[in-house]
Design a protein with these regions (language model features):
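Tandem repeat scaffolds
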Residues: 1-191
Length: 191
């Protein structure tokens, strides 16, 4: 059975919420540790300066939520949807965003090093100057994504990234440069 919400708590440890409606709640400065939120509604929730360690936010809605100055470490946001949310500045360390929908979000300059964004919806997302070193973008939907001046070195990507994204000034490694060339039909020879 899911725990009941108590507004006077600042640390939620090992709690579970399923299908809970948190709409317009104030979670600023809240800390969660190993807590699970399944199919919860966070529309309009203020997460300002909150910190989350080892918590899971699976298939949750974050419409008009405020997550700026928040920290997420070793968290899962599997299948969660972010619409019209204020997300930066934001700290994400080893976060699983597999199947998450971040389409149209402003993630300029956010450090997503090592994050998993497999099959994530990133259509029209602004990731200019973001750091995606070692991130996994396999199978992500990337139409009209903006990655100008982003650091993509070591990121796992599909060929669609190289043909659909805006990449002016992006930092890539040699293997990615070859993948970019191949995606654009270039025939590369050593001699």
């Amino acid at each position: 059975m899911a725990d009941q919400v108590s507004s006077d708590e600042e640390v939620w440890s090992e709690r579970e919420f399923v299908g809970h409606d948190f709409r317009d709640d104030d979670f600023s400065r809240l800390r969660t540790e190993r807590s699970v939120f399944d199919e919860c509604d966070f529309r309009g929730v203020d997460f300002t300066e909150s910190e989350h360690v080892g918590s899971a936010f699976r298939n949750c809605r974050f419409d008009r939520a405020t997550l700026h100055h928040s920290i997420f470490r070793q968290c899962s946001m599997l299948g969660s949807v972010f619409t019209d949310s204020r997300l930066r500045p934001l700290t994400l360390v080893d976060v699983d965003l597999t199947l998450a929908v971040l389409g149209g979000c402003d993630l300029r300059g956010v450090d997503l090093t090592g994050c998993r964004l497999r099959e994530a919806g990133l259509v029209d997302t602004d990731l200019r100057k973001a750091v995606l070193r070692g991130a996994d973008l396999s199978g992500a939907r990337l139409q009209n994504i903006r990655l100008d001046e982003a650091d993509l070195r070591g990121a796992r990507t599909d060929a669609t990234l190289w043909t659909t994204a805006s990449l002016r000034g992006a930092k890539i490694d040699v293997d990615q440069a070859l993948a970019y060339a191949a995606a654009h039909g270039l025939n590369i020879h050593g001699e």
